[in-house]
Each structure stands twice: as C-alpha cells, then as structure tokens.
Design a protein with these regions (language model features):
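N-terminal amphipathic alpha-helix/helix-capping segment at the start of soluble metabolic enzymes
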Residues: 2-153, 407-414
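C-terminal accessory extensions appended to soluble enzyme cores
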Residues: 10-14, 21, 350, 384-390, ...
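Active-site mouth loops of central-metabolism enzymes
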Residues: 15, 19-22, 26-38, 132-161, ...
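Hydrophobic faces of well-ordered beta-strands that scaffold small-molecule active sites
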Residues: 131-137, 173-177, 207-213, 234-241, ...
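Glycine-rich, proline-tolerant flexible connector loops at the mouths of alpha/beta enzymes
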Residues: 143-148, 171-201, 205, 211-217, ...
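Short, acidic/polar
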Residues: 155-167, 223-224, 360-368
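Acidic (Asp/Glu)-rich catalytic clusters
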Residues: 167-170, 198-204, 225-232, 252-261, ...
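Catalytic alpha/beta core domains of metabolic enzymes, predominantly
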Residues: 244-391
Length: 414
C-alpha cells in the first residue's frame, strides 16, 4: 500500500476525495470560494464539465424594410430632333437638253446635280434633283449578249428607230447614240456622216440626247466639233473628252465648239480623282463649269465595282467639302456591267437563266453607284432600266425621317 501511494506521488497525480454530503452541498452552489487556501503543486490540470447554462447569443435585429420599387407606367417623353449636318459646298447644277423656248426642240430638259448632302441622306433632306437614266443605242449593228439583243434586234440597223424604241417602249429619260462607225479601225465614217445620224436621232425623239464618240482622240475631236455645230442650241452632251486629247493637242477644238453652240462636255478619267481635277482645270479654259459632267469610270460588279464606288463617294464628299474642281455632276456608264463575262456567258445550271442574270448584273452595278452619288446613268437592258427607275422612285418617296415614330422601329410577331 505504501508502495502504491509512493508511486502515485512520483507520477504527480493528486486525487481529492470528498464525501457524499459535501458533494450534495456543492451541487446546490454555482460557485465555490476558498479562503486562506494554499496549494503547492508541480503541475495542475483542470477538467471542467460543460456548463448547463450557455452564453446567450445577442438578439438578432431585423433589417429595415426596403421601400417597394415603383414600376414605370409610361415611357419617358422626350422630344427628338434628327441631326441635320450642313456642308460648306454643293454640286453644281447642269442642264441637259433645251426646250423650244430655250432655243432647242426638246419637249423636256433635265437638271442634274445640285446635291448638298451625301447621296440619298433622306433623314437630312431629299435629293434636289432625281437621278436620270439614259439608254444606249449605236449607229451600227454591234455584237450584243442575247439577253439584250432579243429586245432590240429589229432596230439595231436603224439608230433613229432604236432611239424611238428606247423612249416609247423602254421609257428612257435620255437617249445615248454611240457613233462607233467613226472609229478609224471600223468604218472610219466622216464627221458629216456622224452629224447626219445625230440629226436623225434628234428628229426621231424629243428627249435630250448624249452623243458618244469612238475613243480616238483625234477623230472624236473632229466629230464633236461638227456635231456641236449641227445640234446648235439642243444642249446635247458630248461624250467624252479625255486627258489623251489634251496631250494630243485636240482638246481645245471640241471644248470651244461646245461653248459656242451651248452643249455639255463629259470629262472621262479612269478611277483617279487627281486626273479628274486636272482635266476639269484644262476645260475651265474653254467652257464654264456649269457645262461639265464627270465620268469617273464604272467598273462592273466583280471587276472592280468597289473601286468605282469609293471614287464616286470620295468625289461627292469632296464636293460637299467645297472642292470647286470636283463640284460637278457625275455620270455612270453602267452598261459596262456587260463587260463582265459572268453577266452573259453560259455557266452551271445553278446560275441560270442567263436572261435574268445579265439584267441583275447591270442593276446591281448601277444601284451601288446610285448610293455613291451618281446623277445620270447610261444603261441598256430594259429590265435593268425599269428596275433602276423604280428603285430611284422608291427612295425618293420615302420622305424625311419621322421623329414621332422613332419608338416604333420594331415589331414582334409570335
């Protein structure tokens, strides 16, 4: 027994034995306070039985109630004024054709140009003058795609009848007569012969006309001089003069004749605005600016149409920015679309019918340049002409923006 107590003392553990009575008394108390008590121990370990009384948690405070969201019952009403930008410059107005009271014999004339906004900015203001559509005819029988030939085959050897058909059947605003017979490499027709053809066309139709040359700088100069004299007072457009004429020294002759007899000059350059400005500067020496129309070159769909669009758009914006050398109406030879083989050649069945593909090719070419700012179009296929005139009419009748309908721009149907 002594050994056991000794062992317990060596281990450092002390057991305090209390009687049952004392334990009962202690059970009724929540705390015990000892006075004059000393304890010498080497190591003290306290084991506390979990108390039955838990520390009370703080009382949760309810957050203040958020005010109820008020849902809008009406749309915010605010006045909207469409922005209208003013431009410092504008395109000059050019008159094509002359009526009897003006010294000519046309039943009507067309004012082209005059734009003071980018093309068809209807939300700013409608175009001053609607674009004009001319139909191409030729003074000799020329090879044409079947899709075109089938409509004009019966009149291809008679320029006057061809012009009549263009006006009476296909509703052309203007007729273009191309004098290909004057080409030295084709028939080399004389200026007098060419002038006679133009006279016949003037007598056959009463709309303004455009007279096209053969592209030879020397021959065109002679032909235009003669035609200007024969068509005195009719205010025809001579198509076209070029920088090649200036370099060949033949520009002065047709330009002086145009001024003397009251005609227009079509200034042709190939997709280069600097050249267009240079040619215009040279023409200013002979004719007033109000007699000049620009042809900046029309490249067909698939053959550089995007370049033509860019050049025409740049020319319009330059005119609005007050560049006087580019403030001239612009003409597009949209018939050039037929130079694209894809417009008429035989392809796979998925590209048929060719009779529809060709007119679409010409129409798309023309509409793109319409939106770039072209004022007058040379076209050929009757369906393309009809579609183009309808597109122009639809754009013109859209009217200005209606601010009161801004909120109704979309509807949903389920």
């Amino acid at each position: 027994m002594a050994k056991k107590e000794e062992k317990e003392n060596k281990s450092g553990d002390i057991s305090l034995k209390l009687g049952p009575r004392l334990l009962d008394l202690l059970a009724k108390l929540q705390q015990v306070e000892l006075e004059d008590f000393e304890m010498e121990v080497k190591e003290l370990e306290l084991r506390l039985t979990p108390a039955a009384i838990a520390t009370a948690a703080p009382r949760a405070v309810a957050p203040p109630a958020l005010p109820a969201k008020v849902k809008p019952t009406t749309i915010l009403e605010e006045e909207f004024t469409p922005p209208i930008e003013e431009y410092p410059g504008k395109v000059r107005e050019v008159v094509l054709g002359a009526t009897k009271s003006e010294g000519g014999s046309r039943s009507k004339k067309f004012v082209i140009g005059g734009a003071d906004t980018p093309s068809f900015y209807i939300f700013e203001k409608p175009p001053v003058h609607p674009p004009v559509v001319a139909i191409d005819t030729f003074d000799i029988k020329v090879p044409l795609p079947k899709a075109i030939r089938m409509h004009v085959e019966e009149v291809m050897e008679d320029p006057a009848e061809w012009a009549k058909m263009a006006v009476n059947k296909f509703n052309a605003d203007v007729v273009t007569i191309h004098l290909l017979s004057t080409d030295p490499l084709i028939k080399d027709a004389s200026p007098a012969e060419a002038a006679k053809t133009v006279e016949e066309v003037l007598q056959a139709v009463d709309v303004p006309i455009i007279v096209g040359g053969c592209g030879d700088p020397k021959k065109d100069s002679e032909v235009f001089e003669k035609i200007a004299e024969v068509a005195h007072g009719e205010r025809v457009m001579l198509s076209s003069v070029t920088l090649d004429m200036a370099e060949a020294g033949t520009l002065a002759k047709p330009a002086k004749a145009a001024k003397e007899h009251g005609h227009l000059i079509l200034a042709f350059t190939a997709l280069e605005l600097n050249n267009a400005k240079e040619l215009n500067r040279r023409l200013y020496e002979y004719v007033p600016p109000e007699s000049i129309v620009m042809d900046l070159t029309t490249a067909a769909l698939g053959y550089g149409l995007e370049y033509s669009f860019t050049i025409h758009e740049r020319a319009r914006l330059a005119a609005l920015a007050n560049d006087p050398e580019l403030q001239h109406p612009v003409l597009s030879g949209s018939t050039n679309a037929w130079a694209a083989r894809e417009a008429w050649m035989k392809l796979g069945p998925e590209f048929e019918p060719r009779e529809l593909r060709g007119p679409l090719w010409e129409t798309i070419t023309a509409i793109n340049l319409l939106l770039a700012g072209v004022d007058i179009f040379m076209m050929m296929h009757p369906a393309a002409v009809k579609t183009m005139k309808e597109v122009i009419e639809n754009l013109l009748t859209m009217g200005k923006a209606k601010p009161e309908k801004i909120a109704d721009w979309v509807t949903v149907r389920i």
